[in-house]
Amino acid sequence: MANSLLSSNFMGSQIFVSPPTPKTTKYFHFHSKRKSLIPQSILNKKPNSDNSKNIPSKAALAALLFSSITPHAYALDNTTPTVPTPRVIQAEAANPTTSNPFSQNIILNAPKPQAQTNPELPEVSQWRYSEFLNAVKKGKVERVRFSKDGSALQLTAVDGRRATVTVPNDPDLIDILAMNGVDISVSEGDSAGNGLFNLIGNLFPFIAFAGLFYLFQRSQGGPGGPGGLGGPMDFGRSKSKFQEVPETGVTFADVAGADQAKLELQEVVDFLKNPDKYTALGAKIPKGCLLVGPPGTGKTLLARAVAGEAGVPFFSCAASEFVELFVGVGASRVRDLFEKAKSKAPCIVFIDEIDAVGRQRGAGMGGGNDEREQTINQLLTEMDGFSGNSGVIVLAATNRPDVLDSALLRPGRFDRQVTVDRPDVAGRIKILQVHSRGKALTKDVDFEKIARRTPGYTGADLQNLMNEAAILAARRELKEISKDEISDALERIIAGPEKKNAVVSDEKKKLVAYHEAGHALVGALMPEYDPVAKISIIPRGQAGGLTFFAPSEERLESGLYSRSYLENQMAVALGERVAEEVIFGQDNVTTGASNDFMQVSRVARQMVERLGFSKKIGQVAIGGGGGNPFLGQQMSTQKDYSMATADVVDAEVRELVERAYERATEIITTHIDILHKLAQLLIEKETVDGEEFMSLFIDGKAELYISWVSKEED
């Protein structure tokens, strides 16, 4: 930085200037149109003997200087290292027009000469590697001292300053230092800081291990948690919930609609309470009882009822809790569970969703290890192995009995398989009564009608129905739940919520009305078909309208469907397209019947390939028998029939669909007046119930359709 005292604006013939100090020199600012900077070295310089006559006293000079110093003066540097003698610099003649009147013929006192700082060297304590190399090549570095690991060095410059440098992996560095005459040494020991870092590095594995141990301990509930040990050892401990005196709050009185299953389980409870009654006759206590049934039928609820009724220690767990992160954990947890159970015998062990570990052992495809296999092998051994499990009854629940291993289902392990099926009408009435407790109902609520409208519903479905009805009543700010809320809740569960805010044009409303009228008209006039329960053109979910049929209770429970029923079902599905063609013409049909076509094709192909309802194919099942590929039962899918047979199947399917289409067309064209009345009623009211719909048929004197088979016989 240029010194303003050396510029042409400074007045005087000769000025003694000291070399710059190693640190940044602070300056005073003068109030003048052009500011001049005066270093402290000049302020402290002793006056020259030749010019001492023209210099005022020190007090006068100080008063003169400080009178022109701004209030923002900075402190002067006090560092005074010894330096060579000052040199004389000739100042250029100043322009008298721009000179400062306070600077003419003044010689300032300077302190003792300070050490001269090499301007080519950085003034920081940490140098960059490039700066270090430049200084070495210019001969500015006297010696270097490397750290023990060679990652850093400390240098001493020729002017005595010291700095540190981070050293990269440079193989030529030693040669460069030696060529430039730099003294090289290596530190014999680490500094305190490096020693601390090395100590931490040596202790890090132990700290990490202690941290992991602490995390395992916390995850397992701390010392004395599950299993009694805490920490990593709990991985092999069972996570089952134990109740010495079960308090589930559920008894057999709370279970409705599963009378046969309750009877089977009540015997198990009685066996635990009164074993002498059975042992006197030579009977042995069952070792296991498997609850099988669709989801939501109350299998877990029955197990809770057994726990509440038995009065013996009760262990409960989910099968998915056995298999976890490490290999062998599943088998270890099974052993631990049965060890605890045997110590509390007689007792009950309940395993929910046992198919998670009880699946059939696979064919070994893939070459990997399946942890479930070790788990199920241990479970088989504990239930009926060499040592047995006297006094321990195992209850298990699953909705996939088809995938369970056959060794698990044999007598001696699961002696009883209790089927918990969907409830019938009487069972649904009892379930509705149970789930209506605590709910305010109006007098028009008829549980029998609700039960008949909900065939195939499980206990969980009915519980959800009553809960949705209560929510609807609260939304409508009602004090009681009426049949309307229950009906709306049922439709909401089946098809989704109403789209009340949807803007529907008159043309679309008319189209949807004829769609649903076509379904209802064909279904009502087909013999032995399900009666119409309700018709609606209010959009719900993805559907623009819905026609509700009430399925036969007997048909649903038995699962037996006649050929005429399936043909009627296809005709009902095609009624929408037929009505659209008759009313709007062939050129104006829409894609609204696409889902109906998929349903019709599926039913027709099942009739030909699986059900033996084709004269040309006969009583032959076409296609593979199915199976689970992951169990090794069916490793590839291949056709077991020829191309000629496939052509025959396609022709038979097409014939069944065309026959259903002709039947639907005949019904709609014959009763076109009823179709118009029903569509107009739907446009006006948007919803028509079954009773109002049947009144149209009575007024129109509609007749049931005579089946195709009857015509052929005539």
Curated annotation (Swiss-Prot):
Name of the molecule in the record: ATP-dependent zinc metalloprotease FTSH, chloroplastic
TM spans (from-to): 55-75, 196-216
Cofactor: Zn(2+)
A GO CC annotation given for this chain: chloroplast membrane
Principal localisation: plastid
Keyword annotations of the record: ATP-binding, Cell cycle, Cell division, Chloroplast, Hydrolase, Membrane, Metal-binding, Metalloprotease, Nucleotide-binding, Plastid, Protease, Transit peptide, Transmembrane, Transmembrane helix, Zinc
Name of the gene encoding the protein in the UniProt record: FTSH
GO-annotated biological processes: cell division; proteolysis
GO terms of molecular function: ATP binding; ATP hydrolysis activity; ATP-dependent peptidase activity; metal ion binding; metalloendopeptidase activity
Domain of life where this protein originates: Eukaryota
Residues the entry annotates as binding Zn(2+): 515, 519, 596
Cofactor binding note: Binds 1 zinc ion per subunit.
Bilayer topology: Multi-pass membrane protein
